[in-house]
Amino acid sequence: MIHFATRDERLRQFFGAYFNQDWELDDPDVPSVVDRYARDYEGDELDGESVIGLLVKDLRWLVETNKEIPSTDLWNITFDEYGSYYTGEFTGEDAHQWLQWVARRLENHLNKQ
């Protein structure tokens, strides 16, 4: 598996590859997408740190650095900058809370390793 060294590369890989325009054809729901990423990168390391753990930090960074902006703007960032075709905007999901949920779900996978 290719490992991406920078935060932006990892976020683009996660959102662009796993939440691409056809994500609903690959997986039945959002938890399944996140779980597939965790399976794909289970045990992988970059410079001695878990690839999944790095993404957890990246997701938390994304939330923290954008905590003052509206949820709609954060959904737009995940699309415009990172290539995500998932948005909970139409179901009323808050982007900040959703990203934290994704980070927690990935962290749970780490704790099982």
Question: What residue spans do the PLM features occupy?
Answer:
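Amphipathic alpha-helical interaction modules
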Residues: 22-72
